[in-house]
């Protein structure tokens, strides 16, 4: 609203920067995962249609890149610069490729849960979604040695936030895009912390309409998005910048 709270960031900082690595490859729709069709969402094959009842070999290969090469390149980059990351890690992907998680833990990164599967939960029965959440927690706890404290589904149902809050062990969820600061949800029976995420300063826009075509475009957009709350004299309140 017109009088947002003043976030007291350490050292009087104006902007809290959060870098997020979505580790999803291995949890997407695929015939080999028992799904009725191949993945169609967020790939270099723009507008890809799902293959019903058949494997999409190119799509499977595209999604395999993350665990084979992409994640390691990013982890090396953040290690070299000593910058912390939050991994939104899909539990099925964690289980298939635990070495990525082991490396992230060794580097001191936060591992938040991104659900059991990287699928659309809209319309899923509440009992099934709750079972997926419990399975994600079990896998995460086994691989990481402790349960997840952060949660992000991505493609939620109308029940997701309540299910997450009722589980009782999470410090926050990030299934929200509505604010520049964390806030307490009033949609649950008990106070539940929301740390908003972003689909704006997000490299998924390389695979969406009106997105980015070059690294220079993405870099310029990130710089503008960061500089705006810092340089405008009337924007004096601390904020979060998420990438």
Where are these regions (language model features)?
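Short acidic-aromatic active-site loops that bind/stabilize oxyanions
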Residues: 60-68, 126, 215
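Short, glycine/acidic-enriched loop or turn micro-motifs at the edges of active sites
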Residues: 25, 117, 178, 239
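Metal-dependent polysaccharide deacetylase catalytic core of the NodB/CE4 family, i.e.
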Residues: 46-57, 72-75, 79-159, 188-190, ...
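Early transmembrane hairpin module of multi-pass membrane proteins
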Residues: 42, 66-71
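N-terminal regions that are enriched for targeting/export leaders
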Residues: 1-58, 62
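Conserved small/polar residues in nucleotide/adenosyl-binding loops
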Residues: 233-239
């Amino acid at each position: 609203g017109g009088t947002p709270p003043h976030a007291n960031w350490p050292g009087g900082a104006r902007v809290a920067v959060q870098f997020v690595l979505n580790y999803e490859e291995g949890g997407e729709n695929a015939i080999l995962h028992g799904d009725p069709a191949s993945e169609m969402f967020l790939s270099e094959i723009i507008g890809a249609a799902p293959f019903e009842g058949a494997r999409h070999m190119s799509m499977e290969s595209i999604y395999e890149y993350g665990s084979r090469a992409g994640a390691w390149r990013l982890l090396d980059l953040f290690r070299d610069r000593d910058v912390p990351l939050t991994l939104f890690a899909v539990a099925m992907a964690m289980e298939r490729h635990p070495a990525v998680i082991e490396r992230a833990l060794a580097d001191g990164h936060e591992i938040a849960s991104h659900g059991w599967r990287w699928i659309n939960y809209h319309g899923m029965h509440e009992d099934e979604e709750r079972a997926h959440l419990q399975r994600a927690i079990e896998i995460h706890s086994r691989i990481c040695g402790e349960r997840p404290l952060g949660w992000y589904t991505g493609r939620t149902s109308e029940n997701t936030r309540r299910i997450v809050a009722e589980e009782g062990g999470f410090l926050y969820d990030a299934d929200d895009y509505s604010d520049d600061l964390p806030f307490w949800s009033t949609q649950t029976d008990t106070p539940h912390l929301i740390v908003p995420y972003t689909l704006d300063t997000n490299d998924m826009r390389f695979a969406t309409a009106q997105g980015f075509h070059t690294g220079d475009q993405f870099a310029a957009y990130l710089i503008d998005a960061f500089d705006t709350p810092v340089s405008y004299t009337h924007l004096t309140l601390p904020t979060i910048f998420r990438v």
